[in-house]
UniProtKB/Swiss-Prot annotation:
Residues in the signal sequence: none
GO cellular component: cytosol
Protein family (similarity comment): Belongs to the Fmt family.
Entry keyword annotation includes Coiled coil: no
Catalytic activity: L-methionyl-tRNA(fMet) + (6R)-10-formyltetrahydrofolate = N-formyl-L-methionyl-tRNA(fMet) + (6S)-5,6,7,8-tetrahydrofolate + H(+)
SUPFAM superfamilies in the record: FMT C-terminal domain-like, Formyltransferase
Lineage, top ranks: Bacteria, Pseudomonadati, Pseudomonadota, Alphaproteobacteria, Candidatus Pelagibacterales
UniProt keywords, alphabetically: Protein biosynthesis, Transferase
Organism: Pelagibacter ubique (strain HTCC1062)
PANTHER family to which the protein is assigned, alphabetical: METHIONYL-TRNA FORMYLTRANSFERASE (PTHR11138), METHIONYL-TRNA FORMYLTRANSFERASE, MITOCHONDRIAL (PTHR11138:SF5)
Gene of this entry: fmt
Keyword match Ribosomal protein: no
Binding sites annotated in the UniProt record for (6S)-5,6,7,8-tetrahydrofolate: 112-115
Function recorded in the entry: Attaches a formyl group to the free amino group of methionyl-tRNA(fMet). The formyl group appears to play a dual role in the initiator identity of N-formylmethionyl-tRNA by promoting its recognition by IF2 and preventing the misappropriation of this tRNA by the elongation apparatus.
Listed name of the protein: Methionyl-tRNA formyltransferase
E.C. no: 2.1.2.9
Amino acid sequence: MTKKIVFMGTPFFAVPILKSLYEKNYIIPAVYTQPPKKSQRGQKINKSPIQIVAEDYNIDCRTPDTLKTNKEEYEYLKQLDLDLVIVVAYGQIIPKEYLNLAKKGFINIHASLLPKWRGAAPIQRSIMNLEKETGISIMKIGEKLDTGPVGNIYRIKIKDSDNAETISTKLSILASEKIIENVENIFEDKLTFKEQDDTSATYASKIEKSEGEIKWNDNAESIIGKINGLYPSPGAFFIFKDERYKILKAELGNKSGEIGEVMSNDLEISCGNQKSIKIIEIQRQGKKPQNINEFVLGSQIIKGSRITNV
């Protein structure tokens, strides 16, 4: 392949897509990713998954703090004479002036069915809002976040057993399987991009840790959505006797009682719509994850306990 493509991405989600492009032998003169971050204790520098892969492939990996007002990176990209730039969960806004630096523009792979769930956390928000399906949208990058015209949408079902981790994996694999045919169609001018319907747009704002706290007066289905949508991080949690408990996996139960009441020793907890959730896997603050059978052996949370943070 003689076409030159720059790839911009950061998390594991983006890795299979970069691998697909590399294995197709496109010329990839550079990869952009977020700068390495220090660990919490400051002893280790953690590179992004994309940086690790790019270095393994001996691709020039560039990690600017920002592209905005960054003349050096602008000039670098300009001199590459690019055909296309592909962006997958890069984590930075692409400045308007960059968008003319590639002959076929900047293409973004977004993890939602646009115009639904524009923004930073589409996978989490779709699960938390009890959507039955999600997917990926292949779109042109415009001046505003996730508003550009869409070329293709690919859908998958969200199963009851899914969480943000499993859906992320499924969508990443799906994108890696679909990217080559879309890139080739872009180069051959065979892919038609259609403007989004802004009136149908919803927004997937960044997840805040505080959102993970479970309100037991919510309905049981919404609580399950929160648990699944926030797994593995930051996680859904409750406070009992000043200790935090993260619920890693749960399912709908069949008991009802007072809001926040523990209905059985294996932690079936009553919710706000006369339904309950059954905890399957849980993690006590500072401890390792446990399945519920292990957890209840030494737990202070027993039948008749009341979790009152509603």
